[in-house]
Every structure is written in C-alpha cells, then in structure tokens.
Amino acid sequence: MAGCVPLLQGLVLVLALHRVEPSVFLPASKANDVLVRWKRAGSYLLEELFEGNLEKECYEEICVYEEAREVFENEVVTDEFWRRYKGGSPCISQPCLHNGSCQDSIWGYTCTCSPGYEGSNCELAKNECHPERTDGCQHFCLPGQESYTCSCAQGYRLGEDHKQCVPHDQCACGVLTSEKRAPDLQDLPWQVKLTNSEGKDFCGGVIIRENFVLTTAKCSLLHRNITVKTYFNRTSQDPLMIKITHVHVHMRYDADAGENDLSLLELEWPIQCPGAGLPVCTPEKDFAEHLLIPRTRGLLSGWARNGTDLGNSLTTRPVTLVEGEECGQVLNVTVTTRTYCERSSVAAMHWMDGSVVTREHRGSWFLTGVLGSQPVGGQAHMVLVTKVSRYSLWFKQIMN
C-alpha cells in the first residue's frame, strides 16, 4: 500500500497541470503580432542606420514627400522627383516612337527602340542626319541605307570615331587660336579689303581657299585691276598686297535683280597660312540650312562706310536669323531660296559690299552669308545676304 502512494500523487499532478492554462506560450494570433512588431522594429532600425533607399520607399511601396526628402536631402531635387512621381505613368502618353516599347521607372520611363531607331524617345532613324544629335557628325552628314556618313570641311580629316573632324593642314579652314574665339573679334584672318589701281579701298572680301577670295559680283566688276589687301598678323604698318589674276563672276549673275551676286577672285599667289591669313570654311547646304543658320548666332563683320571711304578698323556685330516673310516686308524685297536675312540689335551701320556673316560650330568658323548692295530705304539693323551654302557646287567647279 505504501508503494502506491507516490504513484497516486504523480497521477494527481498530471491531471492538475492538464487543467492549468499554458500561459508561457501565446496563442498563434498574438504570437504573430509579436513577430510582426519585432520585424518592423528591426527594419526601421536598419533604415535609420543606412541611407534612404528610393526604390524601396517609393517604388515597392507608396511613399510620402518626407520619405523622398530623406533620400535626396535636397529640396530642389526632391521637388523635381516628386512632380514626376505624382504625375502618374508616363508610358500612358506613348512617348516611344516608331513602335518602341515603354517601361515605367522611378524617374520616368525608358524606351526600348525598334531596329533602325535610337534616341531617348526612339525619334532618330539611325541612317538619317539629325541636327538634334549630340553625338553626330562634327561637320557634314550624308544619310545612307543603314547609317549616316560624316565628312569634313577643307583641311580636316575624320577622327578615329569617324565623326569628329581633326585639322591636319596648316590651312585648315575656320580655325582660330583660343584667345581669339570671343564674339567681339576685331581681327579675323579671312577678312580682306579690295583695292583699285589707285590704292583706294572699295569693297570687302573673304578668303575661302588660300588662293581664292569670295566677294560680290558687283564689286568684282567695278575695276579692272584689283588687289587684295590684308593687315592680319602684320608686324609693320604695311599691308600684305596680292594681285588678282582671274575674276570668276557667277554665270547667272543678274545685275538688275541683284541675284547670284557672287564672284570668285583668283590670287596671283596663295596666301601663306596661317601667318598671313586663313580661309573660312564653306558649309554644305543641309549643314548650313538645318543647323548653322537657324540654330546658332552669327557674326556680321566688315568695314563700315564713312562717306565714300572705308573705315580702318574691322567692325563686328552679333546677328540672328530673321524669317523671310518678316524681312521681305521690312526691307520691301523678295527673299528667295538663295538669300536670307540677319538682324542686329545694336546701332545701325552702313556696311560696305562684301561684308560677311560667319558662324562658329564646335571650334570651326563657317561662312553663311555675303552682303551685297542693300535695299534703298531699308532698315540698317536688318540686312539681306546671299546664302553661300547654295553655291557649294559652283565653288568646287571653279576652285578644283
């Protein structure tokens, strides 16, 4: 009997424990709450330790402005991001052209272009020339079947990327030393005066090849014996004088209408580059009319008339393109495909015939216009010029 007592006591203890609620262990629902709270507290601690993660805060989840501000730590950048973030899906507007596919991202969208197209919005055909290209040809561009081809102005050759143009000749056109690139240039190596047999200056001209000067047809027919004169880079007071051996007036020059008012003057001997002068570049048609003239500011340069004489100092003025219709109304002229107009915002001047308009593009200066006789009574702050790019074939026929 005594041996049964411990057995009975153990049985009673087991029954008692079975009726007691196991408070050491929580129910599943409460246990999950504890786990969730602990997990959130842990992630919050990590977020405090590390910089804000934009993708986690605003892409995987919906963020508030303050969370984005913690990531950028800059109000301007945050505001820019917030405008895009709250603007909705950019791909809804179908920004990717030519059947490109659009993918939303935290910063906006990304386009995957169809074969043959490129650009941020697939807007550029790979075989075409576009002025908008930031990585396109430095000078001239020719479209092809699968891709475009680059070429360069006189005295340059293509670089290793087949896009950049590298000067390889001492007479490479349009190159200025770094200290003479400012738009208020007072001494341009391609600008020359024309002088008659009596030593009187009567017109201006511009060197476009070391042995050719371009001027107006009217100027070239004023005198029989013409000499080109330049003071560029002269150490003495005496100018460099070179005689003209041949005058090439454009075959379609119309003196009455003033059309095709251009003439090429062939020099007796070539100018020694770069010390005595330097040619300016002559642009191809598409390059000039789609990029140079409409997209860059021009520089009008020449000598102003002081009565019947020309001033001693070369004058330069910044100019911009004027639409043909406006120019035609102001100057009472017909603006053709071979002419265009420039406007200067500074005081009016009486420019001599043969003054020129040049434009700088990526380190090279290009000739875009030559001034002829201006309309009577026209406003001197606006000038009509001959569009040089329309005559590139004629230049090649004469000079080559």
From Swiss-Prot:
Classification via SMART domains: EGF, EGF_CA, GLA, Tryp_SPc
Disulfide bonds: C58-C63, C91-C102, C96-C111, C113-C122, C129-C141, C137-C150, C152-C165, C203-C219, C327-C341
An example Gene Ontology biological process: proteolysis
Role according to the record: Appears to assist hemostasis by binding thrombin and promoting its association with phospholipid vesicles. Inhibits activity of the coagulation protease factor Xa in the presence of SERPINA10, calcium and phospholipids.
Subunit structure: Interacts with SERPINA10.
Signal sequence range: 1-23
Residue positions, PTM 4-carboxyglutamate: E47, E48, E51, E55, E57, E60, E61, E66, E67, E70, E73, E75, E80
Glycosylation sites per record: S93, N99, N225, N233, N306, N332
Single GO molecular function: calcium ion binding
EGF-like domain sequence ranges: 87-123, 125-166
Name of encoding gene: PROZ
Keyword Disulfide bond assigned: yes
Homology family: Belongs to the peptidase S1 family.
Pfam families: EGF, FXa_inhibition, Gla, Trypsin
Post-translational modification: The iron and 2-oxoglutarate dependent 3-hydroxylation of aspartate and asparagine is (R) stereospecific within EGF domains.
Protein name, per record: Vitamin K-dependent protein Z
Cellular component aspect of the GO annotation: endoplasmic reticulum lumen; extracellular exosome; extracellular space; Golgi lumen
